[in-house]
Amino acid sequence: MPTAARKEKLTRVLSRRQPDLQVVLEGVTIAHNASAVARTCEAVGALNLHIISPHPEKVIFNEAITTRAEKWLLIHFHQTTTEALSILKGQGLKIAVTTLSPQALPYTALNYCQPLALVFGNEAEGISTEALSLSDYKIHIPMVGLVQSLNLSVSAAIILYEAFRQRQAHGWYEKRRLPDSEFE
């Protein structure tokens, strides 16, 4: 039986969850990355983590990295990118994909105070052409060094904390965002 203090903490945390800020990992193959992204999702209050993989049984979270954060997330598995992004669009979310395309917006130029799914591609190939074609926004993290990109989990953390910063500045963490049916 949870203590009163534990119940209060859980209520406080749940009241800050952001049901309309969702994260999608497309074809991620390195368990460390999926684990680190799950931990970052939980830290910023993103409740839903979607994983696109034809082999969901191979997606294993490393508890040493997640610190059991996945326990507090709703994790959804999808066989295909079209399936996942169609479901999210059907829920009224806009799709923002990370890409190295020169036409992409800097990640700080995106308005994160809207229903949004952030899609991160796999470590080797990045985002698929399918995800690009289904996206509403294309974003990138500007760089001035010689490397083209950052590690997947680092990119996700940078972008999720920009979403957190914008939503916090607009008071989105000060009022409960989960509907009663999910909050209870």
Model-derived regions, located:
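Post-transcriptional modification and biogenesis factors for structured RNAs
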Residues: 1-184
